[in-house]
């Protein structure tokens, strides 16, 4: 089985999300799947593209037998909502460049999409499910925009909340399958 994992984070980045996605990719590989990962140039948790990756729009590498396709993103750890949105949208846009550059997309049996960030997951669902007709599974690690409301970063019922809530429903409605990190998420 050929699997593409789309994630905003991946090793050598540090933290829970990169560790989970890296472990998932390596676990699937150990079970005999052919796994590719589509991700950003590494920049987390510092918010700066790592040394060895700077000055590039993309980089393909093989890590533990997994093809990793990395694309530029506007890297930031700013709390500023506008800068965070630009970061997410920059990678969401790069997904489209990948799709039309890499001809083997039609060969993927499954595409696993990490959510959040919602703009990336929404773009990936549109691209891989709607345009290329691939079976898509969404790995939910946090409920957005609910988490943002609970953290006080967003107001329920505001325009931004409504946009994120619409994207969230769109992702869930269009995925072929959904799995999460806990019972509360499912």
Outline where the language-model segments fall.
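An aromatic- and histidine-rich active-site surface loop
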Residues: 84-100, 110-147
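Structural motif
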Residues: 109-110, 177
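A conserved catalytic-core segment of Leloir-type glycosyltransferases
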Residues: 39-102
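N-terminal subdomain of nucleotide-sugar transferases
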Residues: 1-64
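Carbohydrate-associated surface elements
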Residues: 181-184
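Membrane-proximal helix-turn-helix segments that form the acceptor-binding/catalytic region
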Residues: 100, 126-132, 159-178
